[in-house]
Amino acid sequence: SAASDVYKRQHKRDQERMNKLSQMSGETFKNHIFETLSKKRKELRNYVGKSKLLVVDVWASWCGPCKKEIPHLKKVYDDYKDKGLSIVSVSIDDSDKKWKEAVDKFEMPWEQLRTSSNEEMKSFMGDYLIGGIPHMIIIDKEGIIVYAGSALRAEKGQLQNLLNEKLK
């Protein structure tokens, strides 16, 4: 049937994306420019190499699963920041206002960035094969990607497992 053909094509595309994502581990990160809450331009490379591991948390104010994960991510940050972890959140929100409201509400103690144009968002999501959010990119001190894909769930201990392995 036509529906099953569409499903098969979609499934094949998803599989290809998953394969490419798994191949991203070991690659050098790709730099992108974002904006801060105060509208300053900041590059991803400004954050890479400052700590043993940088978690880039990709989210948006309208994303339910993203918001549900934030309290767990805050706990992970508290537990690991002295062991070499830093976090930066990148929002793909269209609305500056909604983004800032969400940032105020969740009080994340790390830097908040946003893709400041549709082109930047598309380029960032394309370079990192972001098909949905929450998405996570984890970069080591040398700028090598150690993980890229669906957010490792702090709520389920997935993120902690990777951090325990990499921050020995």
Regions found by a protein language model. Name each.
Residues 2-7:
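Short, small-residue-biased leader/transition segments that mark boundaries at the very start
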Residues 8-30:
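Coiled-coil termination/hinge junctions
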Residues 28, 52, 131-133:
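Short, small/polar residue-rich loop motifs at catalytic or cofactor-binding pockets
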Residues 33-54:
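A short beta-strand-turn-helix
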Residues 52, 58-75:
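Conserved redox-active cysteine motifs that mediate thiol-disulfide chemistry
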Residues 55-56, 87:
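Hydrophobic beta-strand anchors of alpha/beta hydrolase catalytic cores
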Residues 68-106, 117-126:
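Structural microenvironment flanking redox-active thiols in thiol-disulfide oxidoreductases
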Residues 108, 117-164:
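Thiol/disulfide oxidoreductase modules built on the thioredoxin-like
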